[in-house]
Design a protein with these regions (language model features):
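A glycine- and charged-residue-rich anion-binding loop/surface
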Residues: 1-192
Length: 192
């Protein structure tokens, strides 16, 4: 039949099991039916770019506002990103300009995006940021972006999909910032 299922989210569960969430667009399916997977390349590429931009935004926030900035949540879609982080006061226009400038400087360098597998201890020794309280296995994936005189601009633990080089992100623009809870700010951003 002409069964079509649109995947809207993928989450890793119980070790190496990946669960695909979505909705049936057309047709029907029964247990043990064979299906053909077709990736929506544009959606994947746009999501990769926004996800990579989120990592550059996080490091830029830390450099402009201070090391107290930690990720509190995020949303990455093919058309935008939203990033929630710890910070006690509104971000000034000059600070927003600096944050955007940091991201766009790394984008313009078209630096290779690198991923490596290592132990959590090795990741921390290499300067990788990790989410506090998360449980990690014996091996973690470390994402590094943006060459700055032989050092990386951003290094974090991440298992997601990313661009091959920072130039694939495109121009980055913050479109809003707001408070969503005491001590938690939200930034929304777009890319060209």
């Amino acid at each position: 039949n002409d069964f079509k299922f649109e995947v809207t989210d993928v989450q890793k569960k119980l070790g190496d099991l990946f669960v695909h969430y979505g909705k049936v667009i057309n047709g029907s399916i029964k247990l043990k039916d064979n299906v053909e997977l077709k990736i929506n390349v544009k959606r994947r590429d746009d999501t990769r770019a926004y996800h990579s931009a989120t990592h550059l935004l996080h490091e830029s926030l830390r450099r402009v506002l201070g090391d107290h900035v930690t990720q509190k949540g995020s949303l990455v879609e093919p058309s935008r990103l939203r990033f929630d982080f710890s910070h006690m006061k509104p971000i000034q226009n000059e600070e927003i300009d600096k944050i955007e400038s940091f991201v766009n400087q790394i984008v313009s360098k078209k630096s290779e995006v690198k991923t490596r597998l290592m132990t959590p201890d090795e990741a921390v020794e290499n300067g990788a940021l990790a989410l506090f309280g998360e449980k990690y296995g014996d091996e973690v994936r470390v994402l590094s972006m943006g060459d700055e005189d032989g050092k990386y601009f951003s290094t974090e633990l991440c298992g997601g999909t990313h661009v091959k080089n920072t130039g694939d992100i495109g121009k980055f623009k913050i479109i809003s910032q707001s408070s969503i809870a005491a001590g938690v700010r939200r930034i929304e951003a777009l890319r060209d």
